């Protein structure tokens, strides 16, 4: 090889290396699209490595780079191999993550899969978590929909709600007679798609609502129509220990439409001692406060502030301790990539111990499985 040819190749290699380094650096000013990109089900939005724009997080075994980061909430990291100058890598699971077993199949930590057409699942450190691909099946139909039922749609996986249109008028007339509504209240019922409460009617007719409904005048409604605000009580926490979810249904919104609200809840930490703190002669430890301020965690992100939450204790006589009074706090969370979001979190004020246990007594079964629970752990 002649010296001129060698110099030409050396210059070409140098220029290529400089070009790659230039592409790997972050821009001086961020230029992002006005609307955030729409990601596939189960794929979250994260900020790129430069902290500029929101992008769809790369999943297991997908190509990644500084501008296309992996989904850290699923324990994924961009693996560039042994090369220190590589610009692209492959999303791999962190080494400490455990695989999952689901339907006699093994999935790697961070791997996403679709067991059926209605769910998208992900293996996260030995536990399988799924999100529904048919959210309309989980939402509540309008109360103005008589005899609602889910029906299969030809060529589609998800079922849809249908109403008996022919019986709408008869159904509303029956409600009017039952509740003794006047003409204005009948119109209110139709417009709000809620069963209105007439004057002097008994709240026992609506046992699902724990508090007395209130009337809201909303200027956003046509002609200043009234909205009878109704909200159910919060459901029990989905977990007896560790982080769970509590839900309720309300129409307290500008549209006066029934929606489901959720909040994060933790009745007690899973590692909380059961009997060590009991005084002599005592059989229950009702309410315990965290000995020091802690940060709440959710989906790999931590609360911005520290809190000293109260937890429910345990009993040795077969009773169970559950929250008696709670309040809901809107909490700010920060992720490793700088992303921030808010979530409603349950804060326990007091607990009670009784024999009316919603699940086996925590004294002997501190961990329990929900109906149709898909979590399966491996050592």
From Swiss-Prot:
Induction: By growth factors.
Compartments, as annotated in UniProt: Secreted
N-terminal signal peptide: 1-24
Pfam family for this entry, one: IGFBP
Family matches, as PROSITE patterns: CTCK_1, CTCK_2, IGFBP_N_1, IGFBP_N_2, TSP1, VWFC_1, VWFC_2
Matching Gene3D superfamilies: Complement Module, domain 1, Thrombospondin type-1 (TSP1) repeat
Keyword hit for rRNA-binding: no
Keyword terms of this UniProt record: Cell adhesion, Chemotaxis, Disulfide bond, Growth factor binding, Heparin-binding, Phosphoprotein, Secreted, Signal
Phosphoserine: residues carrying this PTM: 184
Domain VWFC, residue spans: 98-164
Example GO biological process: positive regulation of cell migration
Tissue note: Low in kidney, adrenal gland, testes, brain, and ovary, moderate in heart, uterus, and skeletal muscle, highest in lung.
Domain TSP type-1 stretches: 226-271
Cysteines engaged in disulfide bonds, as pairs: 26-50, 30-52, 32-53, 39-56, 64-78, 70-91, 284-321, 301-335, 312-351, 315-353, 320-357
Molecular function terms from GO: extracellular matrix binding; growth factor binding; heparin binding; integrin binding
Domain IGFBP N-terminal intervals: 25-94
Keyword hit for Isomerase: no
A single Gene Ontology CC term: extracellular region
Domain CTCK: 284-358
Major place of residence: secreted
Region feature Heparin-binding, mapped onto this chain: 277-313
Function: Promotes cell proliferation, chemotaxis, angiogenesis and cell adhesion. Appears to play a role in wound healing by up-regulating, in skin fibroblasts, the expression of a number of genes involved in angiogenesis, inflammation and matrix remodeling including VEGA-A, VEGA-C, MMP1, MMP3, TIMP1, uPA, PAI-1 and integrins alpha-3 and alpha-5. CCN1-mediated gene regulation is dependent on heparin-binding. Down-regulates the expression of alpha-1 and alpha-2 subunits of collagen type-1.
Family: Belongs to the CCN family.
Subunit structure and binding partners: Interaction with integrins is heparin- and cell-type-dependent and promotes cell adhesion.
Name of the molecule in the record: CCN family member 1
